[in-house]
Amino acid sequence: MASQLTQRGALFLLFFLTPAVTPTWYAGSGYYPDESYNEVYAEEVPQAPALDYRVPRWCYTLNIQDGEATCYSPKGGNYHSSLGTRCELSCDRGFRLIGRRSVQCLPSRRWSGTAYCRQMRCHALPFITSGTYTCTNGVLLDSRCDYSCSSGYHLEGDRSRICMEDGRWSGGEPVCVDIDPPKIRCPHSREKMAEPEKLTARVYWDPPLVKDSADGTITRVTLRGPEPGSHFPEGEHVIRYTAYDRAYNRASCKFIVKVQVRRCPTLKPPQHGYLTCTSAGDNYGATCEYHCDGGYDRQGTPSRVCQSSRQWSGSPPICAPMKINVNVNSAAGLLDQFYEKQRLLIISAPDPSNRYYKMQISMLQQSTCGLDLRHVTIIELVGQPPQEVGRIREQQLSANIIEELRQFQRLTRSYFNMVLIDKQGIDRDRYMEPVTPEEIFTFIDDYLLSNQELTQRREQRDICE
């Protein structure tokens, strides 16, 4: 009978507890689903200790070696480690606190942090050259180290240093220096002529002789100035050497390098021309070439060279007015004489009484200076055959040349027309009625002048005013 009751009780208990272990899973519950098992294990929650502010030693008693813990408890002065007690930590002199300066007794019976006292030390002082030091207490706080130098050396700087609370040594590191500076002797001063067509000369010399009277050691030698073998410009140049020994003594010496440039007298440009020169234009080896303005031909040597005797070779040429040969076989032969020398303004009119022609010639005759300044030559083609006239200045052109010029430049006899040709023989502008000289000059200045002409125009801006 008792056995039957026991079996019934077990079945009842199993039936009653079955819903409590149903394998239901919730996110973050601490349970994990597993399709291959139906059993689960409930996570046991540890029991939190009962908090009691009356327990005198809720946390262990604080003891900090080489330091002190000053505690304040809510329960009074006799409670130094009860729940809620706060302790301020500090170290003895010569020690540094590592960790928390303030901790509190927590409900977990632990302090809120840890700390300890580390003995303060300074770094080991480095040895000094030609000297030594002795210390009273090694590298510990308040240790004093006194410096001394070897015989023949003098101490410069702090004679003693003390290890301070911040872990640093007081003062600065001294040095032992010898009394005598090194001996140095520079090479002799020298003079050299510049090379042909150059304004510089390459100069060499031997290094200075240096010796130290103390231990014979020279740490470095510095040069103030160009290195040996450098190119020196014209003039005097001071070269200075400075030698340093191991004790930082120094000695200096200097010498002078003088470079001379052989120069010729300054050349003057020819009248109605200009010069282009190499190098500086007046130094030994320089070449100056003579050029003539448009409308002028050079007569004489084209260039001169500055010689070692400081004199120019040859004699200066002159720029003579350009001679135009109108007795040529073709218009091409006529135009070749102006190539790269002159610009041409060719005027064509049906007869000398043409109103446009007379107006244009009148304006140009009043602007001959501006035309010459811009290297412009006027060619006139006026009238009808057989009375047609062609002229350049006072020279008459043949009928064949007149006809070829008209065909080359497409100039009609039927009405007034005019063409401007540049120094390369290219048609640059055409006019069907008179234009002022200022309009022609502006066009030439803006579009046709070479760099050399632009320079001359800036120099001669007011020459025609």
Swiss-Prot record:
A UniProt-annotated Pfam family: DUF4174
GO biological process: angiogenesis; cell motility; cell-cell adhesion; positive regulation of cell migration involved in sprouting angiogenesis; positive regulation of synapse assembly; regulation of phosphorylation; vocalization behavior
Keyword terms, alphabetized: Angiogenesis, Cell adhesion, Cytoplasm, Disease variant, Disulfide bond, Epilepsy, Glycoprotein, Intellectual disability, Proteoglycan, Repeat, Secreted, Signal, Sushi, Synapse
Sushi domain sequence ranges: 69-119, 120-178, 262-321
Taxonomy, superkingdom: Eukaryota
GO cellular component entries: cell surface; collagen-containing extracellular matrix; cytoplasm; excitatory synapse; extracellular space; glutamatergic synapse; synaptic membrane
Disulfide bridge map: C71-C105, C91-C117, C122-C163, C149-C176, C264-C306, C292-C319
Subcellular location, record wording: Secreted; Cytoplasm; Cell surface; Synapse
Signal peptide: 1-23
All residue ranges annotated as the HYR domain in the record: 177-261
Tissue: Expressed in neurons of the rolandic area of the brain (at protein level). Highly expressed in the brain, placenta, lung, trachea, uterus, adrenal gland, heart, ovary and placenta. Weakly expressed in the peripheral blood, brain and bone marrow. Expressed in numerous cancer cell lines and in gastrointestinal cancer cells. Higher levels found in colorectal cancers than in normal colonic mucosa.
PTM notes: Contains chondroitin sulfate chains.
Main location: secreted
CDD domains with a match to the protein in the record: CCP
GO molecular function term, any single one: signaling receptor binding
Keyword match Cytoplasm: yes
Disease: Rolandic epilepsy, impaired intellectual development, and speech dyspraxia, X-linked: A condition characterized by the association of rolandic seizures with oral and speech dyspraxia, and intellectual disability. Rolandic seizures occur during a period of significant brain maturation. During this time, dysfunction of neural network activities such as focal discharges may be associated with specific developmental disabilities resulting in specific cognitive impairments of language, visuo-spatial abilities or attention.
Subunit structure: Forms homooligomers. Interacts with PLAUR (via the UPAR/Ly6 domains), ADAMTS4 and CTSB. Interacts with HGF; the interaction increases the mitogenic activity of HGF.
PANTHER family the UniProt entry points to: HYR DOMAIN-CONTAINING PROTEIN, SUSHI REPEAT-CONTAINING PROTEIN SRPX2
Function field: Acts as a ligand for the urokinase plasminogen activator surface receptor. Plays a role in angiogenesis by inducing endothelial cell migration and the formation of vascular network (cords). Involved in cellular migration and adhesion. Increases the phosphorylation levels of FAK. Interacts with and increases the mitogenic activity of HGF. Promotes synapse formation. May have a role in the perisylvian region, critical for language and cognitive development.
Protein name: Sushi repeat-containing protein SRPX2
Taxonomic source organism: Homo sapiens
